[in-house]
């Protein structure tokens, strides 16, 4: 199978690319390198060579010409803007990059005969859940433009599939992705990251002066937000599992998480424990768009696909992130 990975130079995209390169599929990557890493792309060429296209999805005609020339069988779509707080400040950027570009990509896939589409979505589509644990059937009520832009893209996929049943998709709603590749050759390189474990690892490695806790008055056990943190290698392996699933099954939506959560304070304690560094932490006001609790019910992907997570351990996730920061 010939597979295009959009956003394959990014954090999750590059880890997924690494796993796909160990298969027999022909792999190509498209990325505009606005936040992705050419270093990661060059390093991954050492596993085996693959085509890399430095291109922006907003170049609709260029993307269509690429698809007509390369004749892909499947697309794994990561390319997106992903920062919740930024989406509150600059919503149109998110609707352009996430919803409009994804819609164009879906149209191009249908026009050029792509039959399988794996979409990188988010637990932010659930908004502020009415229950601590959310399944794929839980109400969808995103509370920020990032979540809404992803949900709109999900709806485009459903409608496209209804009109074109030969075009099948799987939507993966990620929970909080964290950590680094377990051989430490890959990690998150973006210098302005806002993900909690990444920021905590940077503090422990001396790359940041302090970590801010954004609110300690949430309705949780210690007043800080609770999230379902999942190791990036387990997220990346889920894409292989759902691509295999689509061979003999219809389109579907899957939560990808571990099914239990940790608070911001618990994550900070874990990072201090594994690093041995008592870095500075300060309290700050709540950020707009942050729900208090988000925990997955991921039983569907476990029951229907071959996905078996291997790194469900907060200390292990924190240590992998810290070790990456020390050497990158």
Predicted region positions:
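Glycine-centered small-residue hotspots that permit tight backbone geometry or close packing
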Residues: 8, 36-39, 55, 79, ...
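N-terminal Rossmann-like NAD(P)+-binding domain of SDR-like oxidoreductases, especially those catalyzing
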Residues: 1-180
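Short, flexible, glycine-rich and Lys/Arg-enriched loop motifs at helix boundaries
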Residues: 38, 175-196, 206-227
């Amino acid at each position: 199978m010939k597979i295009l990975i959009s956003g394959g130079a990014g954090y999750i995209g590059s880890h997924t690319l690494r796993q796909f390169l160990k298969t027999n599929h022909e792999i190509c990557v498209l990325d505009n390198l606005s936040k992705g890493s050419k270093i990661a792309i060059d390093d991954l060429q050492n596993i085996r060579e693959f085509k890399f296209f430095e291109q922006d999805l907003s170049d609709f005609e260029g993307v269509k010409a690429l698809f007509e020339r390369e004749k892909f069988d499947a697309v794994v779509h990561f390319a997106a803007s992903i920062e919740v707080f930024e989406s509150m400040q600059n919503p149109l950027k998110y609707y352009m990059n996430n919803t409009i570009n994804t819609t164009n990509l879906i149209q191009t896939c249908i026009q050029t005969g792509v039959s399988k589409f794996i979409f990188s979505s988010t637990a932010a589509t659930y908004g502020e859940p009415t229950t601590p644990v959310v399944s794929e059937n839980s109400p969808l009520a995103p509370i920020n433009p990032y979540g809404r832009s992803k949900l709109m893209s999900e709806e485009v996929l459903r409608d496209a599939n209804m009109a074109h049943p030969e075009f099948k998709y799987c939507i993966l709603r990620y929970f909080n992705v964290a950590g680094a590749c377990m051989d430490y050759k890959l990690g998150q390189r973006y210098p302005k990251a806002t993900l909690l474990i990444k920021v905590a690892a940077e503090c422990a490695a001396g790359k940041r002066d302090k970590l801010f806790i954004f609110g300690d008055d949430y309705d949780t056990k210690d007043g800080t937000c609770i999230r379902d943190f999942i190791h990036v290698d387990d997220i990346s392996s889920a894409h292989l599992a759902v691509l295999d699933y689509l061979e003999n099954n219809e389109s579907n939506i899957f939560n990808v998480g571990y099914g239990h959560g940790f608070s911001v304070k618990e994550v900070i304690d874990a990072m201090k424990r594994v690093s041995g560094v008592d870095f500075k932490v300060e309290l700050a006001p709540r950020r707009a768009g942050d729900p208090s609790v988000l925990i997955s019910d991921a039983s569907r992907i476990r029951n229907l696909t071959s996905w078996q997570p291997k790194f469900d351990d907060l200390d292990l996730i924190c240590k992998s992130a810290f070790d990456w920061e020390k050497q990158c």
